[in-house]
Amino acid sequence: MLHTIAIRGYRSLRDIVLPLAGLTVVTGANGSGKSSAYRALRLLADCGRGEVIGSLAREGGLESVLWAGPEQPAGARRSGRVEGTTRTRPVSLEMGFASDDFGYLVDLGLPQTAGPASLFARDPEVKREVVFVGPVMRSSTTLVRRTRDYVETAAESGRGFDRLSASLPPYRSVLAEFAHPGAHPELAAVRDRLRNWRFYDGFRVDA
């Protein structure tokens, strides 16, 4: 069962952690972020289908879906002005979930090595991924971790990590590349869970 959904930096959602139960109803005023949460969940599900980069492109690119408010809301509250600012930190969109058995985190950003004249300088890419066991992500529960093109899996000895790949393309997820039930069942389980999520934009409540 899913316990938690976390979203940081997506549209009107600066940083939320949403606890889930058997049935969770999200309510709020217009503009409070309900639609943003729904769309972020669809993006997260696309990670399991290997389609998250294409989905971001169809939304207008990563910069079109990022949180546009101030990086430091506390300072904005003190001044009484809440408005967008020039970014001083790396572009980042983070999403993830935690459940009884496995959890997953993905961090999407922009290339830092492509020059400004590159045609791919604004293309979104996967910066970081983590697959962990149980409802809480920590070093001791991490099974697979990816930083840019480098992927590691927890060593069978229980100490440290073993290299899985040092050349994973930035547009590919570990879930699309290595989720083989025989070799990496934990990746296959997370991938299949995301693939099995279903989304309905509307449904009858009187039937």
Where are these regions (language model features)?
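The conserved Walker
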Residues: 30
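Hydrophobic anchor at the beta1->P-loop junction of P-loop NTPases
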Residues: 26
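Conserved P-loop NTP-binding catalytic core
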Residues: 39-113
